[in-house]
Curated annotation (Swiss-Prot):
One of its GO terms (cellular component) is haptoglobin-hemoglobin complex. The modification Phosphoserine is found at residue 51. Keywords: Heme, Iron, Metal-binding, Oxygen transport, Phosphoprotein, Transport. Gene3D superfamilies: Globins. It holds the Pfam family Globin. It comes from the Eukaryota. Belongs to the globin family. Heme b binds at residues 64, 93. This is Hemoglobin subunit epsilon. The lineage of its organism: Eukaryota, Metazoa, Chordata, Craniata, Vertebrata. It comes from Sus scrofa. PANTHER family: HEMOGLOBIN FAMILY MEMBER, HEMOGLOBIN SUBUNIT EPSILON.
Length: 147
């Protein structure tokens, strides 16, 4: 179980309030599919993913990114119960979709990269540390049903 300090919670929620979920989610999932092309196998129904520009412009990638980051918002609201918050999604990704749990860690890193690019100097090392802790906690929670 991940424990967040009051300061970490404040830093995370403060930045989250400024995040454009649709834009950030689409960019994070798109970047995941470009940087780690083997992850594309889970998204056969998404249509044209023949090039980085096709992936980044794909409306289904953007829609899924929004869905992912909306769910990530639940983590921000429930930092003290990540495992419970993601129990159903963990089961879905493990039992039905058979997603490699390592992909959750990779996606978390993509989210951090996009946040850093969007917030520049505001995304200090302290802010990054708090967010890395959160995305790692979410990845662990999503991988829970695999154990």
């Amino acid at each position: 179980m991940v424990h967040f300090t009051a300061e970490e919670k404040s830093v995370i929620t403060g930045l989250w309030g400024k995040v454009n979920v649709e834009e950030t989610g689409g960019q994070a999932v798109g970047r995941l599919l470009v940087v780690y092309p083997w992850t594309q196998r889970f998204f056969d129904s998404f249509g044209n993913m023949s090039s980085p520009s096709a992936i980044m412009g794909n409306p289904k990638v953007k829609a899924h990114g929004k869905k992912v980051l909306t769910a990530f918002g639940d983590a921000v609201k429930n930092m003290d119960n990540l495992k419970g918050t993601f129990a159903k999604l963990s089961e879905l990704h493990c039992d039905k979709l058979h997603v490699d749990p390592e992909n959750f860690r990779l996606l978390g890193n993509m989210i951090v990269i996009i946040l850093a690019s969007h917030f520049g100097g505001e995304f200090t090392p302290e802010v990054q540390a708090a967010w890395q802790k959160l995305v790692a906690g979410v990845a662990t929670a999503l991988a829970h049903k695999y154990h």
